[in-house]
Amino acid sequence: MDHFNLAGPESNTSITSLEWLGIKNSFTGSHWAHITGLSELHPTGFLCLIATLIIGIVHLTRGPKPTVLPVVNPPGTFELTANRVKKEWLVDARQIIRRGFEKFPGKPFNMIAADVGLTTVLPPEYASEIRNNPSLSFVAFMAHLFFSELPGFEPTREGMFDNDIGITVVHKYLTVNLARITEPLSREATAALKDIFTDNSEWHDANLKAINLALVARLSSRIFLGEELCRNEEWLKITVNYTVDVMKAAERLRRVPGPLRRIVHWFLPEAQKCRDEVKRAGKVIRPVLEKRRREKATMESEGKEALQYNDAIEWFEQMAKSQGTSYDPEVVQLFLSTVAIHTTSDLLTVVMADLARNPEIIEPLREEISSVLRDGGWKKTSLTDMKLLDSVLKESLRLKPIAVVSMRRVAMDHLKLSDGTFLPKGTKMAVSSHRMWDPDVYENPEQWDGFRYVNLRETPGQDKHAQFVSTSERHLGFGHGKHACPGRFFASSELKVALCHILMKYDFELAPGTVVQHRYSGASYYADPAIRVMLRRRNVALPSWFER
């Protein structure tokens, strides 16, 4: 909503203690007694009621007082709304947070965010303290961002809870089967690159973000939907567009007063588009699923072993059967696409831009890839052994994470931090990611160094922390703790396979006049969508494992 009350929608300084307890003070004396029936109450009962009320009031007023935290970006004295500061937050959130820690070093403070309102920003050192706190809810925060109870928003609800079928499939099938999906990813990369990057051996230019989005959509869909659907143009269009459309729809609905959202969304073009895309997704996926179910039923009736597919369609079927539950296939598949495709393609774009600006590292990467894959190709340990490539990914994510804050949560109960700060129930909070650019933590933190984490591995005890998929308060690219990105292991494999093919098969450089300028939108941090590159197919002989 446009109007913003720093004390929150439940706050009203004129309310009395009796009103807070649900008793209006507009009735007094005998009139109040008559209305409530107290005139007929035995004196002892009346005294007990009064005593109970007094005890309740004393308990409420003597409870722990919330810490009054400073607001780094408050409205001006004569501003009636927070519209101006919200607009500033949308374009300059990183600088607002930086200003907060300059004014209040090492201390929590509040900021007004355009997406969820008043938010407590915690220093990075609090990441380990709160990472697994059961009183802090990621689900409640997501409920503030999206409106998953509304038609068309269902994929944003999937994955909120630990026992959701989407999260369970990621943990129990996708991550466990990483070694089995490497070759399918490689085969699809071969086909997709011919279509998207082309086999043109002459220099030609392309929009980097666009070609990477198309590539990652193909690779992800190969694992999520299998060979039959991963090249389906209708599905690829839906899976790329839905994420953008649902975010636009949610942003529009946040401007609408809460009670009206259930009505307004029916007429909102962005929400209508989301509903349409969910329906279209079902029309693409359900016929394939029904075909598989019929095939399995036939084979089982004939006493034959049912066909097993190595994709998420199969995994969802197995998980639903084991849980004895039902699910919407289009919803869970759009959930996977929403959390995977745009974030992965964004990082691939950032990495390729970093490599183009640091071309001296490309040959060492090619040498590592050739060395690792020379003996046996895509083995189980192949991607793990590419330590320089792993370092490059982690370094690019360090300098340009997907957001400038991480671990966004809502306190479901009162919370007392180790420094004594008391945060009341309902507090929305986030941990600043600025330690990733802290000169006290990293040497030359603003400079991209692809060897940074390779070198860190040589420090005793640091090998684990140097891995791309590891999380800590020093590197919050994937979050930290219980709700750290569960799909980061798949993203790592997908990115490494894609980059192996790109680096070995293509030369690329920034197009003339291109200046890389990644974009902020509130706390989000996006790869520059305007980057153009020159690329060409390399005329080199490659081992057969690059064609399979």
UniProtKB/Swiss-Prot annotation:
SUPFAM superfamilies for this protein: Cytochrome P450
Enzyme Commission code: 1.-.-.-
Pfam families reported in the protein's UniProt record: p450 (PF00067)
Keyword Oxidoreductase included in the entry's annotation: yes
UniProt pathway annotation: Secondary metabolite biosynthesis
Gene Ontology BP annotations: secondary metabolic process
Keywords, ordered alphabetically: Heme, Iron, Metal-binding, Monooxygenase, Oxidoreductase
Phenotype of gene-disrupted mutants: Abolishes the production of heptelidic acid.
Superkingdom of origin: Eukaryota
InterPro entries: Cyt_P450 (IPR001128), Cyt_P450_CS (IPR017972), Cyt_P450_E_grp-IV (IPR002403), Cyt_P450_sf (IPR036396)
Family annotation (PROSITE patterns): CYTOCHROME_P450
Cofactors: heme
Residues binding heme: 485
GO molecular function terms attached to this record: heme binding; iron ion binding; monooxygenase activity; oxidoreductase activity, acting on paired donors, with incorporation or reduction of molecular oxygen
Family to which the UniProt record says this protein belongs: Belongs to the cytochrome P450 family.
Task performed by this protein: Cytochrome P450 monooxygenase; part of the gene cluster that mediates the biosynthesis of heptelidic acid (HA), a sesquiterpene lactone that acts as an inhibitor of glyceraldehyde-3-phosphatedehydrogenase (GAPDH) and a growth inhibitor of the salt-tolerant lactic acid bacteria in soy sauce brewing.
Protein name: Cytochrome P450 monooxygenase hepE
Organism of origin: Aspergillus oryzae (strain ATCC 42149 / RIB 40) (Yellow koji mold)
